[in-house]
């Protein structure tokens, strides 16, 4: 005969009745993390947002939040956090990290190109020869003309048109 249990008496050895207790603070921390994830998603461009695996409800909520200002945006971020609680945030976070890392790599490349341009204008032919050994596809004559023009503009205190053109040329030829 089965043993009767009172209402307050729980058999903790029974696996079916095992309950995992989560503290209220942990729930709040998780909720805040999801709201921050939602805020990061709102800051993305539409092209980058398409690269993130989101369902239609979440995409619509994010698009709406992008058009809101201040208090409405804050409420919408809370709503996005609520929607994220019902989904697995790991694939979304991984895709977001990939998008952000790609952006950081692009920024680092642009900074490197700026340094190369500065070296070309300041050091002249020695820097140009070094650059051409690394990137033989570059047009030597065109680069020399741009470098000379940038140096003359700097001496005459004119706007740096050739200086910018060197950067654009390097960006199109090296970055791609």
Curated annotation (Swiss-Prot):
The keyword RNA-binding belongs to this UniProt entry's keyword annotation: yes
A GO BP annotation: assembly of large subunit precursor of preribosome
One of the record's GO molecular function terms: rRNA binding
Domain of life: Bacteria
InterPro entries membership: DarP, DarP_sf
Any GO CC annotation of this UniProt entry: cytosol
Main localization (coarse): cytoplasm
Subcellular location, record wording: Cytoplasm
Pfam families to which the protein is assigned, alphabetical: DarP (PF04751)
Keyword entries, A-Z: Cytoplasm, Ribosome biogenesis, RNA-binding, rRNA-binding
UniProt family annotation: Belongs to the DarP family.
HAMAP family: DarP
Entry function: Member of a network of 50S ribosomal subunit biogenesis factors which assembles along the 30S-50S interface, preventing incorrect 23S rRNA structures from forming. Promotes peptidyl transferase center (PTC) maturation.
Name of the protein in its database record: Dual-action ribosomal maturation protein DarP
Source organism: Actinobacillus pleuropneumoniae serotype 5b (strain L20)
Gene encoding the protein: darP
């Amino acid at each position: 005969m089965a043993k009767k249990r009172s209402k307050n008496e729980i058999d903790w050895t029974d696996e079916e009745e095992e309950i995992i207790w989560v503290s209220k603070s942990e729930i709040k921390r998780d909720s805040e993390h999801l709201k921050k994830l939602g805020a990061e998603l709102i800051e993305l461009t539409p092209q980058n947002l398409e690269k993130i695996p989101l369902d239609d409800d979440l995409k619509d909520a994010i698009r709406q939040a992008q058009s809101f200002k201040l208090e409405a945006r804050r409420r919408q971020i809370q709503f996005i956090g609520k929607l994220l609680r019902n989904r697995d945030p790991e694939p979304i976070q991984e895709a977001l990290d990939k998008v952000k890392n790609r952006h950081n790599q692009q920024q680092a490349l642009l900074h490197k190109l700026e340094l190369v341009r500065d070296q070309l204008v300041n050091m002249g032919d020695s820097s140009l020869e070094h650059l051409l050994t690394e990137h033989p596809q570059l047009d030597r004559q065109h680069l020399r003309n741009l470098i000379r023009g940038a140096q003359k503009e700097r001496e005459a205190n004119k706007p740096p048109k050739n200086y910018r053109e060197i950067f654009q040329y390097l960006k199109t030829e090296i970055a791609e």
